[in-house]
Amino acid sequence: MSETTRLTNEYIEITKQDIEAHERTAKEANEYIRNSTAQYHGRCVKALYVPKIFTGREERIFSDLVSTMCGIFYKVMDAYAKDEDYRRLFGFEPKLEELILREPTYDSPIPIARIDIFYNEETGDFKFCEFNTDGTSAMNEDRELNIAIQKTKAYQQMAETHEFKSFELFDSWVETFLEIYHSSQNPKEHPNVAIVDFMENATEMEFQIFAEHFKAHGCKAQLCEIRNLQYKDGTLYTPDGMQVDAIYRRAVTSDIMKHYEEVGDFIAAVKDNAVCLIGDFRTQIAHNKILYK
């Protein structure tokens, strides 16, 4: 039996000792979630009372996996840029290929990603589900669910004898974002950041939290409907006139291509390198399902 399974069984046994008390704190956790920011178009995320627990072993496995996969992704992206025959395998339309082939303006080929896997915790074996390198999300759901779980009786009892930690995904991403931005040409110390998406698809509450974290790091930051960006005289602006230095792109590539004619100012600014696009179109190479074949 793996340590992960043993800990899960221990957690379950604790919940059996006082069912009524655990039911009460489970309801309190659910009530917290219902009133939290972990919502998408009015719907709340759901979770089990017993969380998935991983140990240092899994953390090492996942860390090695990420390092290996990023190395593979970078080789694939490099081959795509250099080999026309290889590019044809991906089947991207010419307008998207043009955006992908732009010369990178910073050092990180894939600034952020979520690699989804089916994991066998007994053996450490896994199968890939998705390489999400385009519009990666769910950081806020993770944050809020961890807060909710920590309010439960079972978690508090387990925490008396075990040390738990969760991963901080907001300040860590903002700091990484700014590090990447500062590797681009002529960076400002504190850039003005636009978090852009098609707002009918956006996880707006998550964006608002990211904006607050950017502000805490000395930046101006706004949520912005990607269609409403304005490109004038070599500068990109938000509708209220904020000059945009860097974009945190949450608009997925498929939506951008679907609405290509509606986002002309955004596209023009990107092609002119008038703005630093964190989450550039080259990430679509790793995101494409052709890599499974």
Q: Where do the PLM segments sit?
A:
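Preference for protein termini
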Residues: 1-293
